[in-house]
C-alpha cells in the first residue's frame, strides 16, 4: 500500500466513525466525537490528496512532522508555486473545512454546544465535500465505503429535506 493509500484509508475510517457517532442514540460525547473525527478525516484525506498529486506533507524544518490541516487546506485550495495539480478544493469548500476545524477546536479544548440542526448541516456539508475530494482526486465515491443501509435517523426532520 502506498503512503497516500494509507492516509486515505485512515481518512475513510475516521469518516465512518463520525457517521457512526452522528447516528448514536445517546448524547454523551456525540457532538465532540463527530466534530473531532470529521476534522481528522479531512486532515488525512487532504494529506492523501497532496501525496497523490505529487506534493509533500512533511514540514520543511527537518523534524519529520507532517503539516497542519490549515496548511493542507491552503495547498489543496491554492496549489503551490511548484505544483498547481494539488488544487482540489474550491474556496467555499476550504472555508467549510476551516469552519469545521474551528468547531473542532472548541470541542477539543473548550465546552462545545452545537445545536442539532447545526451539527446536521455541518456533517451533511462535510459529507458532500468528502465525496467531492474522493471523486476529484481518487476517482472514487463515498458509497464505495459506506454500506447502503446507512440512514440518518432522528426525531426531527432535517430542514433541508422537510417538505
PLM feature spans:
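An N-terminal domain-cap segment
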Residues: 18-36
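Flexible secondary-structure boundary motifs
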Residues: 50-92
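Active-site-adjacent bridging/hinge elements
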Residues: 8-19, 101-105
Amino acid at each position: 500500500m502506498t503512503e497516500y493509500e494509507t492516509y486515505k484509508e485512515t481518512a475513510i475510517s475516521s469518516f465512518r466513525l463520525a457517521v457512526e457517532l452522528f447516528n448514536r442514540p445517546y448524547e454523551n460525547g456525540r457532538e465532540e466525537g463527530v466534530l473531532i473525527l470529521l476534522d481528522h478525516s479531512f486532515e488525512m484525506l487532504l494529506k492523501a490528496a497532496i501525496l497523490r498529486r505529487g506534493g509533500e506533507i512533511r514540514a520543511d524544518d527537518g523534524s519529520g512532522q507532517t503539516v497542519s490541516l490549515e496548511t493542507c487546506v491552503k495547498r489543496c485550495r491554492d496549489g503551490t508555486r511548484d505544483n498547481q495539480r494539488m488544487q482540489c478544493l474550491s474556496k467555499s469548500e476550504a472555508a467549510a473545512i476551516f469552519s469545521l476545524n474551528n468547531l473542532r477546536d472548541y470541542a477539543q479544548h473548550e465546552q462545545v454546544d452545537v445545536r442539532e440542526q447545526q451539527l446536521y448541516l455541518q456533517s451533511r456539508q462535510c459529507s458532500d465535500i468528502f465525496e467531492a475530494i474522493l471523486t476529484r482526486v481518487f476517482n472514487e465515491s463515498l458509497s464505495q465505503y459506506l454500506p447502503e443501509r446507512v440512514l440518518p435517523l432522528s426525531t426531527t426532520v432535517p430542514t433541508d429535506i422537510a417538505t
